[in-house]
């Protein structure tokens, strides 16, 4: 089927449908009245969302306000079209997790087609000969292997089993720099690594405790001694240079202030110390190293005992979504 403006309009309406519950629907909020429709205040026609099909190959988008970064925003997959017949065949218009994404059912319009998926084993894609720029696609296919252990992944690369890997253990960086200088590359990466507090339960329902934990983190030591991959200490939630944004540093390392804030909370609650805090992260050697490093900082500065709890990815996502955590790993990637 040809990709038309109707496919985009249908896809935008679907992702904004409040019954679908898409996590990235807000990416389309720059469209006029999109938030009103998504939040259930008005029906699609009544809301007059700023999406209009002028003809099969002309789509008109009207914005709520001027958005200087709008063209860059369109690179996000939330703006990509979905195949309407496939969506409707599998009842996926208002449902997430139906069979429409299985290899035998999925229909896309990118340079590759999903050809196989063995859970926890491999994802395979093959070249899409119907792609508009197929002549520029040099690869016949790609296999993606989900490997949790970074050393296993590195060994698979060095043996020739993998052609490319993005995960390297911090403990191996110096060795790889020396032995494989032409293979190891550090590339700019737009993202922020952070921890999420559960604000609905003690002790993080109190701002003083949250600030104390934040001030007790030595970000310089974390990136220099633990991560070692050229990361920058995060002093704001949004990384510098995002869409020309120059953030004002908000986070700093101040152990004395951290101790005072926590002591104020403990005195008010009549406590000698905080009960053990459970820190949840999805299974990964890298996440474990960061968690252990922060555990040490919080124990040394605040006298807090941290219990580390790792979970399989889907279980982790479900637990966080349900609010079943005290402190959890998180990330934001642009």
Model-derived features with residue positions:
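Second-shell loop/turn segments in exported
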Residues: 1, 47-49, 100-102, 143, ...
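Aromatic- and charge-enriched surface segment that lines or borders ligand/interaction sites
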Residues: 1-25, 60-62, 153-156, 203-205
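Append "and occasionally in soluble cytosolic enzymes with long acidic Gly/Pro-rich linkers
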Residues: 126-127, 185, 205-300, 307
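Gly/Pro-rich hinge or "lid" segments in bacterial periplasmic/extracellular proteins
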Residues: 30-52, 56-58, 62-141, 149-151, ...
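Extracellular/periplasmic solute-recognition and catalytic clefts
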Residues: 115-126, 143-201, 220, 224, ...
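Short, well-ordered beta-strand elements
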Residues: 8, 59-60, 110-113, 123-124, ...
